[in-house]
Design a protein with these regions (language model features):
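Active-site regions of metal-assisted phosphoester/phosphodiester hydrolases
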Residues: 1-141
Length: 141
């Protein structure tokens, strides 16, 4: 991760606490959408250049493990559901077009999977080093 061992330990402590909260949320059996720049990746394919993956932010074994555990516990990556093609990236740590990572996503309750209609990354205009993830859901509010 970024920021060294202290920052990584702090991040993993936070993720552990978040897991406890998300377990309670999941038990309510309602649909939840959590959007953000997670700075986590579940798969090496989420990095344009995963050659030295252990040094990439969000792709350490502990970070990947946390996210994969979350996905196996009743949550899903809405972007992968709406756009299963590889090679879509949302963050460029160096601020250029090289070394893209897909660290931003919508994490959703599995009961919302059938509601995902389309997913894409808005990259027509650079708004920052992150590109917004857009998901179209078929929901009635």
């Amino acid at each position: 991760g970024v920021g060294g061992p202290g920052a990584m330990a702090e991040k993993m402590t936070f993720l552990s606490q978040l897991s406890s909260h998300l377990e309670k949320v999941r038990n309510k059996r309602r649909g939840y959408i959590l959007c953000g720049g997670w700075e986590l990746m579940a798969h090496h394919a989420d990095a344009e250049d995963a050659g030295n993956s252990s040094s990439l932010p969000g792709l350490s074994a502990s970070e990947r493990g946390w996210l994969l555990d979350l996905f196996s516990s009743g949550y899903s990556d809405a972007f992968s559901e709406g756009d299963p093609e590889l090679g879509a990236y949302t963050w460029w740590p160096d601020g250029d077009d090289a070394g893209g990572l897909r660290t931003d996503t919508h994490i959703i309750s599995e009961i919302l999977l059938e509601r995902v209609r389309r997913a894409y990354i808005y990259d027509e205009k650079a708004l920052s080093r992150h590109a917004p993830v857009v998901i179209d859901y078929d929901l009635t509010l």
